[in-house]
Amino acid sequence: MKETIRKFVPKFILALHWKYFKSRLSQFKGKETEDVFTTIYQKQYWGNKESVSGDGSTKEETQNIANHLPHVFKEYGIQSMLDIPCGDYYWMQHVTKDGVAYTGGDIVADLVESNNRKFEKQ
Protein backbone atom coordinates (compact mmCIF):
# COMPACT_ATOMS: atom_id res chain seq x y z
CA MET A 1 0.00 0.00 0.00
CA LYS A 2 2.76 2.43 0.96
CA GLU A 3 4.59 1.72 -2.29
CA THR A 4 1.44 2.44 -4.29
CA ILE A 5 0.92 5.72 -2.48
CA ARG A 6 4.54 6.71 -3.07
CA LYS A 7 4.06 6.23 -6.81
CA PHE A 8 1.21 8.73 -7.01
CA VAL A 9 1.86 11.30 -4.29
CA PRO A 10 4.45 14.00 -5.04
CA LYS A 11 7.66 13.63 -3.02
CA PHE A 12 7.33 17.06 -1.40
CA ILE A 13 3.90 16.05 -0.02
CA LEU A 14 5.37 12.85 1.41
CA ALA A 15 8.23 14.87 2.94
CA LEU A 16 5.77 17.31 4.52
CA HIS A 17 3.72 14.44 5.90
CA TRP A 18 6.81 12.78 7.37
CA LYS A 19 7.95 16.06 8.94
CA TYR A 20 4.49 16.58 10.49
CA PHE A 21 4.38 12.97 11.70
CA LYS A 22 7.83 13.25 13.32
CA SER A 23 6.89 16.53 15.03
CA ARG A 24 3.78 14.90 16.52
CA LEU A 25 5.82 11.96 17.77
CA SER A 26 8.55 14.15 19.25
CA GLN A 27 6.31 15.04 22.20
CA PHE A 28 6.69 11.45 23.39
CA LYS A 29 10.48 11.21 23.16
CA GLY A 30 12.03 10.02 26.40
CA LYS A 31 8.68 9.32 28.09
CA GLU A 32 7.68 6.07 29.72
CA THR A 33 5.27 3.88 27.74
CA GLU A 34 2.51 4.34 30.33
CA ASP A 35 2.83 8.13 30.09
CA VAL A 36 2.75 8.03 26.29
CA PHE A 37 -0.45 5.99 26.10
CA THR A 38 -2.09 7.89 28.95
CA THR A 39 -1.48 11.13 27.02
CA ILE A 40 -2.81 9.55 23.82
CA TYR A 41 -5.97 8.49 25.69
CA GLN A 42 -6.52 11.74 27.57
CA LYS A 43 -6.00 13.95 24.52
CA GLN A 44 -7.83 11.53 22.19
CA TYR A 45 -4.71 11.69 20.05
CA TRP A 46 -6.02 9.34 17.35
CA GLY A 47 -8.95 11.68 16.70
CA ASN A 48 -11.44 8.91 16.01
CA LYS A 49 -15.03 9.66 17.03
CA GLU A 50 -15.98 6.01 17.27
CA SER A 51 -13.14 4.65 19.42
CA VAL A 52 -10.43 6.36 21.46
CA SER A 53 -8.25 3.37 20.57
CA GLY A 54 -7.96 4.67 17.00
CA ASP A 55 -9.01 3.86 13.46
CA GLY A 56 -8.00 0.22 13.75
CA SER A 57 -10.59 -0.31 16.49
CA THR A 58 -13.71 0.84 14.64
CA LYS A 59 -16.56 -1.58 13.97
CA GLU A 60 -15.86 -1.42 10.24
CA GLU A 61 -12.15 -2.26 10.60
CA THR A 62 -12.79 -5.08 13.08
CA GLN A 63 -15.93 -6.56 11.52
CA ASN A 64 -14.12 -9.57 10.04
CA ILE A 65 -12.37 -10.63 13.24
CA ALA A 66 -15.45 -9.86 15.35
CA ASN A 67 -17.52 -12.18 13.16
CA HIS A 68 -14.95 -14.98 13.24
CA LEU A 69 -13.89 -14.97 16.91
CA PRO A 70 -17.02 -16.77 18.19
CA HIS A 71 -16.30 -19.61 15.73
CA VAL A 72 -12.68 -19.77 16.90
CA PHE A 73 -13.81 -19.88 20.55
CA LYS A 74 -16.16 -22.78 19.78
CA GLU A 75 -13.84 -24.72 17.45
CA TYR A 76 -10.94 -24.70 19.91
CA GLY A 77 -13.01 -24.97 23.09
CA ILE A 78 -11.69 -21.67 24.40
CA GLN A 79 -13.03 -20.95 27.88
CA SER A 80 -11.05 -17.84 28.79
CA MET A 81 -9.47 -14.93 26.98
CA LEU A 82 -6.91 -12.33 28.05
CA ASP A 83 -7.02 -9.21 25.86
CA ILE A 84 -3.96 -6.99 26.36
CA PRO A 85 -4.02 -4.17 25.42
CA CYS A 86 -7.81 -4.03 25.38
CA GLY A 87 -8.00 -0.30 24.71
CA ASP A 88 -11.50 1.09 25.11
CA TYR A 89 -13.11 -2.35 24.50
CA TYR A 90 -15.14 -0.66 21.78
CA TRP A 91 -15.30 -3.40 19.17
CA MET A 92 -14.73 -6.34 21.47
CA GLN A 93 -17.92 -5.56 23.39
CA HIS A 94 -19.85 -6.58 20.27
CA VAL A 95 -18.22 -10.01 19.99
CA THR A 96 -20.35 -12.93 21.19
CA LYS A 97 -18.38 -14.52 24.01
CA ASP A 98 -20.82 -17.23 25.18
CA GLY A 99 -19.04 -19.39 27.73
CA VAL A 100 -15.76 -17.46 27.42
CA ALA A 101 -14.47 -15.65 30.51
CA TYR A 102 -13.10 -12.38 29.13
CA THR A 103 -10.42 -10.35 30.92
CA GLY A 104 -9.13 -7.10 29.45
CA GLY A 105 -6.08 -5.18 30.57
CA ASP A 106 -4.40 -1.97 29.51
CA ILE A 107 -1.46 0.21 30.55
CA VAL A 108 -3.71 3.30 30.87
CA ALA A 109 -5.20 3.30 34.39
CA ASP A 110 -7.92 5.89 33.58
CA LEU A 111 -9.06 3.79 30.64
CA VAL A 112 -9.23 0.62 32.75
CA GLU A 113 -11.31 2.46 35.38
CA SER A 114 -13.63 3.81 32.68
CA ASN A 115 -14.05 0.35 31.16
CA ASN A 116 -14.76 -1.17 34.57
CA ARG A 117 -17.53 1.38 35.16
CA LYS A 118 -19.05 1.08 31.68
CA PHE A 119 -18.90 -2.68 31.39
CA GLU A 120 -19.14 -3.91 34.97
CA LYS A 121 -22.19 -6.06 34.16
CA GLN A 122 -20.54 -7.82 31.23
Which residues are covered by each model-predicted region?
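Conserved N-terminal segment of class I S-adenosyl-L-methionine
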Residues: K2-Q122
